[in-house]
Design a protein with these regions (language model features):
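Collagenous Gly-X-Y triple-helix signature in extracellular proteins
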Residues: 1-173
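Short, low-complexity, charged amphipathic interaction modules
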Residues: 171-192
């Protein structure tokens, strides 16, 4: 077991048994992204702050991910600036959200390509610019960006912020032991 601050960006750790990738160490904590996609619709329009996806991620999904320990996850500010620069939706503050399109670009070199198309929180445009409230940007299986209609059902590998001193286990926790050491440990436990 190690503190999150001991892991480099790109490392895989387990949070309550869920494999996550370390994206970045920030002043206010460490940003992680879940590696297993969940599927969900985005919502009735492209504003993440009032979307079905946000409600699900910060409700039932958060209950499961944290095993009821909601206080472990820190709130973070989510920039909902559209691809065309519209700031109509402003900043949303929540605990769990997909990455922004800018964050996908920032972490492109360490994020594995998705198994299926997945949502970002970034709208293509907003109603005040051209009346569009339907298109949301996302990540294709090729790693390229693209847009899709908000009422569709696609994947999400949500991100969340934990205190950097939070203790987690590396995904390959047993990899540091030799086979001999593991077998000896098993035999010593069998003798107890």
């Amino acid at each position: 077991m190690k503190m999150l601050s001991d892991f480099q960006a790109g490392a895989t750790v387990k949070y309550h048994g869920e494999p996550c990738i370390v994206l970045e160490h920030r002043k206010d904590g460490t940003l992680l992204m879940v590696l297993e996609q969940i599927e969900h619709t985005f919502g009735s329009d492209n504003n993440f702050a009032k979307s079905d996806l946000r409600e699900h991620l910060n409700g039932a999904y958060m209950d499961t991910l944290t095993q009821g320990n909601h206080g472990e996850i820190l709130k973070r500010a989510i920039d909902l600036t559209a691809v065309n620069g519209s700031k109509q939706y402003g900043i949303d503050t929540c605990c769990i959200a997909p990455l922004t399109f800018d964050e996908y670009r920032k972490y492109h070199d360490i994020i594995p390509k998705p198994e299926k198309w997945e949502w970002s929180v970034t709208p293509w445009s907003t109603p005040c610019v051209d009346g569009d409230e339907t298109w949301v940007m996302g990540l294709l299986t090729s790693g390229d960006g693209g847009g899709s209609y908000c009422t569709s059902t696609y994947g999400s590998r949500p991100a969340f912020l934990l205190p950097s001193n939070y203790v987690v286990e590396p995904e390959n926790a047993l990899a540091s032991y030799t086979t001999r050491e593991l077998v000896e440990e098993l035999f010593s436990r069998a003798d107890e």
